[in-house]
Amino acid sequence: MAILKAAKDCFWKYGINKVTVEEICEKAGVSKMTYYRNFANKKVVAVMVLKDIISKSEQLYDEIMSKEIEFPNKIKEVIVLEHEYSRGISQEFIQDVTNNEDEELQQLLVEANKKGQQKFIHHMKEAQKEGWVRKDLHFPFLIHMMNDINIKLKDEKLIAMYDSIEDLIMELVNFFFYGIVSHEKLK
């Protein structure tokens, strides 16, 4: 639907809070009457947009992880996916989503994060059995570090070190998977 696409584009660029229903309608090429016939308010649209983003990213992650390729190549593809999904994202969007006090939105994020972590840990354990992941890796530590990445996305001092939130996201993802070792040398 044009309204949801327009809303996603606007939210991605300016955040949820700064975008008005009028701006969404203008970008979608619809009247406010059409908007309100379909959606009660901006929050409903924001939740639908986030559900769609989460669903699509889960689907793409699952497709990558089900491929018949070696684990390091799967990780490379996941990193490319992260890069694609973070392209053009604004700091405002990240802040609006992570600092939002709306209960439904928070529950959506908590559930998506939990589900994503469970899938990821499952795949890491499988890779561990195949010898791709250190045998001594403590998975609760890994989960803690994954949660810490979300906290880092709110760190104003850290954010200020990068030209864009997209650059910071990629730095965090690469650091998480590769540490400080050149992944070129790991080949």
Where would I find each of the regions flagged by the language model?
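Phosphate/oxyanion-binding loops and surfaces in catalytic or ligand/nucleic-acid-binding neighborhoods
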Residues: 56, 67, 78-89, 130, ...
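Secondary-structure edge/capping motif, primarily at the C-terminal ends of alpha-helices
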Residues: 64, 93-101, 153, 157-158
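Short secondary-structure transition hinges
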Residues: 80-121, 132
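All-alpha amphipathic helical-bundle segments outside canonical DNA-binding/catalytic cores
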Residues: 72-73, 111-113, 129-145, 163-167, ...
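Short, amphipathic alpha-helix enriched in basic
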Residues: 1-27
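C-terminal peripheral helix-coil segments that are non-catalytic and often amphipathic
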Residues: 118, 122-130, 147-149, 155, ...
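HTH DNA-binding helix-turn interface
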Residues: 12-16, 29, 36-48
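Hydrophobic alpha-helical connector segments
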Residues: 48, 52, 61-88, 143-146
